[in-house]
A protein has these predicted regions:
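Glycine-enriched, solvent-exposed interface loops adjoining structured elements
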Residues: 1-114
């Protein structure tokens, strides 16, 4: 997690894997799961090509379909699209998610990873 960057906490509901992580003027740059002892487990960001291999998409609306119940546990990666954050695997317990943000660049400027 970045020092000095805006951070937002989300209490995860077991079985819910979509989070509205919008913060006007900012983009998501990192996520971590916080356990009961307040230890942070960073999540790896994946690109669309890797996420599509794991999760089937609905042809009618283009949204990812809910994975089967068997595929639940401690999230290890996330996919960020628009203002929605998708966790993989689906959370099995009520952990806390910490999300780091960075300001968007000027309009039309390419986004850079730090």
């Amino acid at each position: 997690m970045n020092k000095g960057a805006p951070t937002k906490d989300f209490d995860l509901v077991p079985g819910k894997w979509r989070i509205n992580a919008s913060l006007p003027g900012y983009k998501v740059v990192g996520c971590a799961i916080e356990d009961l002892r307040r230890r942070l487990f960073p999540l790896r960001q994946v690109e669309a090509s890797e996420f599509v291999k794991l999760v089937p998409f609905d042809d009618t609306n283009g949204e990812p379909m809910e994975p089967p119940v068997v595929l639940r546990g401690l999230p290890k990666m996330y996919y960020y699209y628009g203002q929605t954050l998708y966790l993989w695997s689906v959370p099995l317990h009520a952990w806390r998610l910490k999300v780091d943000y960075a300001p968007h660049g000027p309009a039309g400027a390419p986004l850079t990873h730090q």
